[in-house]
Amino acid sequence: MIELKDTNVILTGATGGIGNSILENLITTGANVLATGTNEDKLNLIQKKYKNVQTEKFDISNHLEIENFINKANESLGGRIDILINNAGITRDNLSIRMKDEEWNEVIDINLTSTFLLSKSVVKKMLKSKKGKIINITSIVGHTGNIGQANYTASKAGVVAMSKSLALEYGKKNINVNCISPGFISTEMTDKINDEYKEVLKSKIPMNRFGTPNDIANTVIFLCSKLSDYITGETIHVNGGMYFS
């Protein structure tokens, strides 16, 4: 079992299906977690349930407050941030010809720009500690494209390219930057897909099933651990073989 005792972690998007699974797995490792999200009720439930978790309602689209948020998080975690997990993200699907400027801008702002600004602010803290890990959750469609998601696919592809650049810039400073690219994962979002189309999607997956949030969380824990210390600038695909089929 991987242990992350005395490891300080910031997790964004902690109240969603994948985010909550990441949080629960982090807790089993003994990590100290600051979990963020926009759903105050769910954050309150997290705070009551787990003793080694701090929660903070924070909208990552508020770019002007990101550095201030990281400064406060650094203080509340005892002056050291070891790991940042950028999991928060949104979709605003539409065919490209119908896509409104605000649909494009909102997705790029939150999924790409906010991820960059959070990483930038955290790197400043990690440079002082001379170590750190940044894990960015992307998506299979950032590699394959997808109908009706020009904004989302561009944002996730951008995160992959940005992560490679950060890995090159800060590798010598002992800061690892990696991505995890989920395929189709069983969440509230995929639960809304009708059964017939689910079977069509599964037929394109060599393992013939959707993944679980825990599949993603297990990969996150690996990248958080010392087992991944010599891995940086990489994207781990967790999609049952769909990307390669």
Feature locations, PLM:
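Conserved glycine-rich cofactor-binding loop
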Residues: 15-16
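Short, small/polar-rich loop/turn modules that mediate ligand/substrate recognition or access, typified
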Residues: 171, 176, 231-233, 239
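Substrate-binding pocket helix/loop in short-chain dehydrogenase/reductase
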Residues: 95-96, 100-108, 190, 201
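Alpha-helical segment proximal to the catalytic Tyr-Lys
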Residues: 124, 168-172, 229
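The beta1-alpha1 cofactor-binding region of Rossmann-like NAD(H)/NADP(H)-dependent oxidoreductases
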Residues: 58-69, 101, 214-215
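Residue(s) in the substrate-gating loop at a strand-loop-helix junction
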Residues: 139
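Active-site helix of classical SDR
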Residues: 119, 155, 163
